[in-house]
Amino acid sequence: GDRLMAEVIKVVGKNVYVQVFESTRGLKVGAEAEFTGHMLEVTLGPGMLSKNYDGLQNDLDKMEGVFLKRGQYTYPLDKEKKWLFKPIVKAGDEVEPSAWLGEVEENHQPLKIMVPFQLQGTYKVKSIVEEGEYTIEDTVAVLTDAEGNDIPVNMIQKWPVKKAMTNYKEKPRPYKLLETGVRV
């Protein structure tokens, strides 16, 4: 059958109540569910400012037809496009989650490539690539934790949509309305 994306609302015994994000036609009470082990999350990285997404971050330009097919999903970022990565840190630097490792440019907008948000503590930059073109899946840095474990870092981050980000030094308040001309 189709694999439908849903979010667990509550669990009672062996029963799970879910919110399904598309048509539930054909589903029955008692149908089996597969748990991915992940919360509903967004994929962050270079290329997302150039895409047209639906509410589940499907790339609408890759999907055929006027209506989305049930159970059809696309990866939200282009895994083959190369981005000009410019390192900001150097080997030996100490970094923390959300620290800037380097940057790429998308539509004349600099995008920071950061230490993964979900990490905790301080890390040493073991290596960082030279300025050059890389895909979002290429390893651009290797970090070492306090126990000596190496953590490869690429340009992709996943973040649960219902979890607030807390790894920031300052959270500026908006001071100007962003007018898009689009009615929401």
Give each language-model segment a name:
Residues 8, 52, 100, 123-125:
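Conserved hydrophobic positions within beta-strands
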Residues 3-5, 112, 122, 139:
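Well-ordered beta-strand positions in beta-sheet-rich domains
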